[in-house]
């Protein structure tokens, strides 16, 4: 009952479309969708594209570039509105890009790795754009409803955790039933819900002078650079970069062994009886 009362308070104080947006983006797309995509992409690279672990690792890191440049998407959502809206058009754009990229991967036979990589990058771009957009919505709601800010973060974490738990629990089942390409087709559903969020989201339309957009964009970049050159900021960023860059990641090699028909336990679509 406390959980229901807590959720009801969020719905009453903010807006139901905001809560739906958080659940869709954090729970269904990033939680469930990421878990399903992670397992499906591993098998897609090995069983469909027939790539070696070293090749797969490189391609997957390239495909994640849209997530690396998330600050750029954030600048666009804050500074460049469409038809007076800063959030709704970006949810719609992210949904359309994600749907098309997932269906392209799902429906094409013998897709060239270059086209597959572009499709994966497009899908990640859709996810990254939606992520920064919903974060902007949360930041706005946290300012207007300061007492509910911790509860909003709890909603984000809870949605993501539950979605990921369900996604990883069912990913093997879906992979067995419909294969890696079928999984990509299934992943178009979270992006369709993302598109629906863009249509339904409650957002006030604002008057915008588009002639000021370049100046605002440049000012935002300069403020960002001013922040980054502070020692207490760039030092922490440099430490995090080095810690990630020097950390060995043997996931693709381990996955190759796990799915090998001779040396490993053969957990593979390509070798199942």
Question: What are these regions, as identified by a protein language model?
Answer:
Residues 1-16, 206-237:
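Juxtamembrane intracellular "pre-TM" segments in multi-pass secondary transporters
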Residues 28, 101-130:
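Hydrophobic core of transmembrane alpha-helices in multi-pass small-molecule transporters
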Residues 39-55, 250-272:
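Short amphipathic helix-loop junctions that connect adjacent transmembrane helices
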Residues 57-80:
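Central cavity-lining transmembrane alpha-helices of secondary-active solute carriers
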Residues 63-70, 148-175:
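Glycine-rich segments within core transmembrane alpha-helices of 12-TM secondary carriers
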Residues 75-82, 105-107, 164-185:
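Transmembrane alpha-helix termini and helix-breaking/packing motifs in multi-pass membrane transporters
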Residues 93-102, 182-200:
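Symmetry-related core transmembrane helices of the 12-TM Major Facilitator Superfamily/SLC fold
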Residues 122-158:
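Cytoplasmic helix-loop-helix junction between adjacent transmembrane helices
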């Amino acid at each position: 009952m406390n959980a229901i009362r807590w959720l009801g308070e969020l719905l009453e104080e903010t807006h139901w479309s905001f809560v739906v947006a958080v659940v869709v983006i954090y729970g269904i797309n990033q939680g469930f969708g990421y878990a399903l995509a992670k397992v499906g992409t591993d098998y897609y690279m090995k069983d469909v594209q027939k790539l070696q672990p070293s090749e797969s690792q490189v391609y997957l890191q390239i495909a994640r570039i849209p997530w690396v440049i998330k600050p750029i998407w954030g600048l666009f959502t804050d500074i460049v509105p469409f038809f007076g809206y800063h959030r709704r058009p970006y949810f719609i754009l992210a949904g359309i890009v994600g749907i098309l990229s997932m269906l392209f991967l799902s429906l094409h036979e013998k897709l060239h790795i270059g086209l597959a990589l572009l499709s994966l990058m497009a899908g990640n771009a859709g996810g990254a754009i939606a992520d920064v957009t919903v974060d902007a919505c949360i930041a706005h709601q946290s300012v207007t409803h300061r007492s509910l800010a911790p509860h909003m973060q709890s909603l984000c974490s809870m949605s993501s955790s539950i979605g990921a738990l369900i996604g990883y629990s069912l990913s093997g089942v879906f992979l067995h039933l419909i294969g890696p390409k079928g999984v990509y087709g299934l992943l178009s559903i979270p992006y369709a819900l993302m598109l629906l969020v863009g249509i339904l989201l409650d957002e006030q339309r604002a008057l915008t002078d588009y002639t000021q957009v370049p100046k605002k964009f440049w000012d935002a970049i300069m403020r960002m650079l001013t922040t980054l050159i502070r020692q207490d900021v760039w030092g922490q960023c440099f430490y995090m970069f080095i810690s990630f860059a020097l950390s060995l990641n043997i996931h693709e090699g381990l996955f190759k062994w796990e799915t090998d028909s001779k040396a490993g336990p053969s957990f593979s679509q390509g070798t199942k009886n």
